[in-house]
Each structure stands twice: as C-alpha cells, then as structure tokens.
C-alpha cells in the first residue's frame, strides 16, 4: 500500500494534478506511472481545450530587461480572474515567457500571425534554394512548403521549443499552465527591443 501512496505523491508533484485525479489515473493505468502520466496529460489537454473558449480579461504585463540593458521585453498574458493573476504559478509562467521571448526572438504569438511580407520573403528564398537543387517541380514545391512550415514554426512563439525545456513547445507549456491554474490563459501580445 505504501508504494501506491508514494506513486500518488510522486505524480502529484510532477503534474500538479489533484489527489483524486491522480488516484483515478493510477487505477485506470493499473498502477503504471507512465500510463498514469499519459492519462493525466490527456485530461489536462482536454481541460485546456474546454477552457480555451472562455474570455480572459485579467492578467499581467511582464517586463524583462536583460542585465546589460540591451534587450527588453514586454509581454501581456491574460487569464480569467485577478486571483489567478496573482498566483506564483502564473507569475512564474509570465516571467518564463518574457525570458523566452528575450532569448528566442519570435516574430509573433501564433503561426497564423506571421507577417505576410516576411512569409513572402522567406518563400522567395526557399524557392531559389529549391530550384538550384534541380529536382522535378512537384518535389521542389514540397521542399518549399516543408521549409516554410519549419520556418513559421521557428518564428511563432507558441510553436517554438521552450528555452528552459526544449522537449516541449511554448504552446505545450501554456496548456500545462491552464491545467495547473484551472483557468484559460492566453499570451495576448508582446514587444521585444534590442540595441
């Protein structure tokens, strides 16, 4: 029985899920920790998807200025209530996002927000590079689309690998935060300055 309690404690620390949720996930997975983690992650994503339709009118504007004073970031992160906006988890998330923006230099929040001019310029570069390969046209088209898709994912904040943990994207970190705080959280906008 002690091993079951230890597993519950371990999963609660790792996932920040409630005790009953952890207990149910362990039961469903037959006591398998990896299976329980997977179940909790799926439930967290389902909760995040459900909450994503809720309006967010509260939040924080987080400021970060690099120690040398040459890089600065302002990011607006919204949530549903001022109570959540004051929690340490939410504040840490905002700080992490500001630090990520300072180091990774995204152009926009979501892939669909990538400026058309930048996309057209990148498409032109990719087409020239693909044409130099001497491949058939349909393969060249696929190469261009693949390179553009990769480039867009590197430029949009939500699809970038998270700077502190490259094993997950900023979007996945956002979903984890939604499941931790129990409210919808939205990265609304940001601005990055560099001398």
UniProtKB/Swiss-Prot annotation:
It holds the Pfam family EF_TS. PROSITE patterns: EF_TS_2. Residues 81-84 are annotated as: Involved in Mg(2+) ion dislocation from EF-Tu. SUPFAM superfamilies: Elongation factor Ts (EF-Ts), dimerisation domain, UBA-like. One of its GO terms (cellular component) is cytoplasm. Keywords: Cytoplasm, Elongation factor, Protein biosynthesis. Transmembrane segments: none annotated. InterPro entries: EF-Ts_dimer_sf (IPR036402), Transl_elong_EFTs/EF1B (IPR001816), Transl_elong_EFTs/EF1B_dimer (IPR014039), Transl_elong_Ts_CS (IPR018101), UBA-like_sf (IPR009060). Gene3D superfamilies: 1.10.286.20, DNA helicase RuvA subunit, C-terminal domain (1.10.8.10), Elongation factor Ts, dimerisation domain (3.30.479.20). The keyword Ligase does not apply. Belongs to the EF-Ts family. PANTHER family: ELONGATION FACTOR TS, ELONGATION FACTOR TS, MITOCHONDRIAL. This is Elongation factor Ts. The lineage of its organism: Bacteria, Bacillati, Actinomycetota, Rubrobacteria, Rubrobacterales.
